[in-house]
Amino acid sequence: MRKIRKGDEVVVITGKDKGKRGTVLRVLETKLVVEGVNVAKKHQKPNPVRGVAGGIVEKTMPIDASNVAIFNPASQKADRVGFKVLEDGRKVRVFKSSGEVIGA
């Protein structure tokens, strides 16, 4: 079970985008693609066969998972993730500061 999943809201805790918040769009092995964070400009060549216009395109690049923390909406701060087994046997993610279940 991963600590950060697709759809989670995260805060960048270090690097050039420190303090920015965004939603996780994609989870890679050790990196995350976060909406609006680590945006790079790519020079794209036109491809008439695919119908792609050329030019400078802004693309969201992956950021290392260690540089982000999950956002706790109750405290409005970055938080750490822990795991807890419920009475019915399900393993769920919880916020370390408050103990409440993430995504419930």
Curated annotation (Swiss-Prot):
The keyword Ribosomal protein applies. One of its GO terms (biological process) is translation. GO terms for molecular function: rRNA binding; structural constituent of ribosome. Gene3D superfamilies: 2.30.30.30. The keyword Transmembrane does not apply. Keywords: Ribonucleoprotein, Ribosomal protein, RNA-binding, rRNA-binding. SMART domains: KOW. Belongs to the universal ribosomal protein uL24 family. Part of the 50S ribosomal subunit. One of two assembly initiator proteins, it binds directly to the 5'-end of the 23S rRNA, where it nucleates assembly of the 50S subunit. One of the proteins that surrounds the polypeptide exit tunnel on the outside of the subunit. This is Large ribosomal subunit protein uL24. It comes from Chromobacterium violaceum (strain ATCC 12472 / DSM 30191 / JCM 1249 / CCUG 213 / NBRC 12614 / NCIMB 9131 / NCTC 9757 / MK).
